[in-house]
Every structure is written in C-alpha cells, then in structure tokens.
C-alpha cells in the first residue's frame, strides 16, 4: 500500500486491505466458525426432537443412532476449533507481519527532521505491542462477531418456530442489550487510546533510562531517573484504571443481561405454560437456546475490548503511516554518477523548523581530494553544514552542488551512496566487526574490509581479538573497550 492509499482511504478500509493477500485463510476461518455455530444450534433442536419423538416411543435404536451422530458432530467441532485456533492465529500473525514490515519501511523512509522530535520508545511501542493489538482485532473480532451473530439469529429463528410470543420477548431484549454494548464500546475505545498514549510514554522513558544507564550510574543519578520513570509509570497505571473502569461497567451490564434473560424465559415461559400455550419440553428447549447465547455474548464482551484496543492502535498506526517525508526526490531528479568530489556551497542559509537561523550566507568551494576542517564554538553550525551536503535537510536559501549538480536535483539514494558520513555519536550494530565495516558498502569483499581496517589503523587491534573480524561488538559496541 502506497502513501496515497493511506491519505485517501479511511482507517477501516486500510485495515481490511491487509486481509486481501490472506483471504483464503480468512475464508477457511469463517467457514469453520459457521460450522461450529450450526453444530451448537443443532443440539437443542435435536434434544427437543428426542424428547418429543424418541423417548415416549422407547425408540432405543434410533435414539442411540442420533447420539452417535451427535458424538461425531462434536468430534468435527473439535477439529474445526483446532483449525480456527491454529490457522486463525496464523492468519493474524501474517497480517501482523505485513503491518510491521510496512511500518518499519515507512519509518526508514522518513526524513531526518522527523527523528529530531520522534521518541524511540513510542516507535518501539507501535512496532510491538500496538501491532499485537491490531492482530488480535484482525483475527478474533470478525470470527467472534460472525459466530455470535449466526448463533443468536439462528437461535431466534428456531425459537420463533416453537413459540413466537416467548421468542418475541427475547428478540426485543437483545437489541436493547446490543445498543448498550455499542455505547460502552466508545467509552472503552477512548480509554484504550489513552492507555496506548501512556504506554508509548513509559516505553520512551524506559528506553531512555536503559540507553543512559551508564551515564546515570557515573553521576549517581539513579534516583532522578527512577523519579522520572515513576511519573510515567503512575500515569500509565491511572490510564489502565480508567480503561478497567469502563470495562467493568460493560461486564456488569453483560452479566445483568444474561441473568435477566434467563429470568424472562422462566417468567414468560411459566405464564405461557399455565395458559396452555407452551409445554415443559419447549420451555426446556428455550432454556437450552438461551444457554447457547452465553458463549456468544461473552465473546462479544471480549470482542468489544479487542475492538477498543485494536481501533485505538490502528488509529495511531494510520497517523504514523500518513506522516510524509519532508524531503522528497524532485520529479526530474537524476542519479549522481562518476562522482569526482567537487563541493560548491553558495550563499547557504539554514534554520531548523520553528527556530532561528543556524547558518547565514555561507559560501565554500571544496576541490576533489581536498581536506577541510570546520572549527568553531559549540552550536556554530559545523554539524548542520555537514548534514546539508548529503541533503539530510534542505537549505533555507542558497544552494549546494556536487560536481555541478544541485543536491536537490539528485536522487537521495545516489547522494547517500556516494557520500560517506561518520556521525558525531558513533553507532555500532550488535553484529560482527566485519559486518559493521561492510555497512558502508554492503557488497564489499573480505579483502576490501581488511583494506578498510588497515586504512583506519585498527587492523592489528582486530587481529588480537579471539575471533578477529568475526568478533561480536555487542549493543552499540559495548563489548569493545
């Protein structure tokens, strides 16, 4: 799905588009769900038939044949349950994988400016726990709603064929309950969105605390970091309490409905029996069908929570996916080829978004092979100028050219492939030394890696390590001295 689709489509349209590649698994899940619902609906009807026809006539052979069929039906039901459990969750995981890949790819494509304000912990939350909520929503919600709908409607149809007056009373009660459920959904959804927001905040503080753990210990500031974390932790606790309060109201309403529905069946059914409009067998059948409502209604209660969590996470997902890169290739952008290395900086000015000018009317011309050092006080714009050359940001005024080509007229990919950048904050991936060196040229041979290590004057140090170039450097190079 491209950026245009995320801009033009509604959230649920975006959500349903992820079903398309896995529609066969989804269809299998729905067919098995339908089969389970039909088996559950058949049991009370078969029980009624046995009580009416077989038991009074002492039809032993037919009775046991029917019981054998029921037994086989429940074996099939178990098979269908296995299929729903295994393949249904497989379907959900595949959708989650697609969501996560699209989100990670989109994050990779965002401009430098986005990460000036973005928090790593929030992004981690959206890539992990919030995508899990969307997965549970994708897998369970359609299945549970489908089973519940088929079971409730099917049971009502059968009950109308038995005694329409009692069935009508039940049919009137159910929409009232569903209306209350729908209203509860909105309060739970709003509470769930707040939980997601606070969860992202606590992940941000957690990530920051872990990343700065050595610094905190060096300055004996553990208590300060704990206070910061406690504040976010308590806010998350309060948001969870609000969510559980909304969920508690919903569950209380649901339990009241189930109890009152059983009471209505006994009360109205008893009155109909006393007026010779209903018999005991049909009342038992009605009670059995009402009991079949219990599982679907309980599923609906869980589904409402899944919908609340899933739609809240989906909303945050779509918001992030709709965030566009501030820097894009020009329609007529060309690839830099056969780069010599001449850099022309002409009357460049630059200001970060909503900030004062960092650079004003800077001009500089660097010949191929020439070495230039920018020297000055902190905050003078040295790093900013170096980040404008590979076009991590766009100049506010003036221009920067490489071999006579304005960097805004070159593709960003070709710029980044031809310009090497060593960041102020050195970052090493949790991989081998060889793979970290190869990162600047993914197809580099081992000979090229060794040559690069010798040029950086680290070859001898590497060879003194037990595993040489295969030595794992750890997270951010923590295993190196």
Regions found by a protein language model. Give the residues of each.
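Membrane-integrated ABC transporters
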Residues: 1-40, 55-66, 84-92, 105, ...
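An intracellular "coupling" helix at the cytosolic face of ABC transporter transmembrane type-1 domains
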Residues: 16, 21-24, 112-113, 129-138, ...
């Amino acid at each position: 799905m491209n950026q245009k689709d995320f801009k033009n489509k509604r959230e649920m349209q975006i959500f349903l588009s992820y079903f398309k590649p896995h529609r066969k698994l989804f269809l299998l899940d729905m067919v098995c769900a339908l089969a389970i619902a039909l088996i559950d609906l058949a049991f009370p009807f078969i029980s009624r038939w046995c009580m009416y026809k077989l038991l009074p006539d002492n039809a032993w052979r037919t009775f046991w044949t029917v019981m054998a069929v029921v037994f086989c039906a429940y074996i099939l039901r178990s098979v269908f349950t296995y299929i729903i459990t295994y393949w249904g969750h497989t379907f959900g995981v595949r959708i989650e994988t697609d969501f996560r890949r699209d989100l990670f790819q989109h994050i990779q494509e965002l401009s430098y400016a986005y990460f000036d304000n973005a928090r790593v912990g929030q992004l981690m939350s959206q890539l992990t726990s919030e995508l899990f909520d969307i997965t549970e929503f994708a897998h369970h919600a359609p299945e549970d709603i489908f089973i519940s709908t088929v079971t409730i409607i099917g049971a009502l149809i059968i009950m109308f064929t038995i005694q329409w007056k009692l069935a009508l009373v039940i049919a009137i009660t159910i929409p009232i309950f569903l209306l209350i459920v729908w209203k509860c959904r909105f309060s739970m959804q709003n509470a769930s969105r707040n939980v997601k927001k606070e969860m992202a905040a606590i992940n941000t503080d957690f990530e920051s605390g872990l990343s700065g753990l050595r610094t905190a210990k060096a300055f004996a500031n553990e208590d300060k970091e704990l206070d910061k974390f406690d504040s976010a932790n308590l806010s998350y606790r309060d948001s969870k309490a609000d969510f559980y309060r909304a969920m508690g109201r919903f569950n209380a309403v649901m339990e009241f409905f189930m109890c009152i529905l059983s009471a209505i069946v006994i009360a109205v059914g008893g009155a109909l029996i006393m007026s010779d409009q209903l018999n005991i067998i049909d009342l038992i059948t009605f009670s059995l069908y009402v009991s079949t409502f219990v599982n679907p209604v309980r599923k609906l209660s869980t589904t409402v929570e899944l919908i609340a969590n899933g739609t809240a996470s989906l909303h945050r997902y779509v918001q992030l996916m709709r965030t566009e890169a501030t820097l894009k290739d020009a329609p007529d952008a060309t690839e830099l080829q056969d780069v010599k290395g001449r850099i022309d900086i002409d009357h460049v000015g630059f200001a970060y978004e909503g900030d004062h000018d960092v650079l004003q009317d800077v001009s500089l011309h660097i010949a191929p092979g020439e070495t230039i050092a920018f020297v000055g006080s902190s905050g003078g714009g040295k790093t900013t100028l170096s980040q404008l050359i590979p076009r991590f940001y766009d100049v506010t005024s003036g221009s920067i050219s490489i071999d006579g080509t304005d960097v805004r007229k070159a593709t960003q990919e070709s710029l980044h492939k031809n310009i090497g950048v060593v960041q102020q904050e050195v970052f090493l991936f949790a991989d081998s030394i060889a793979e970290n060196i190869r990162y600047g040229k993914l197809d580099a041979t081992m000979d090229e890696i060794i040559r690069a290590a010798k040029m950086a004057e680290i070859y001898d140090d590497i060879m003194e390590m037990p595993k040489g170039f295969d030595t794992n450097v750890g997270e951010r190079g923590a295993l190196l001295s």
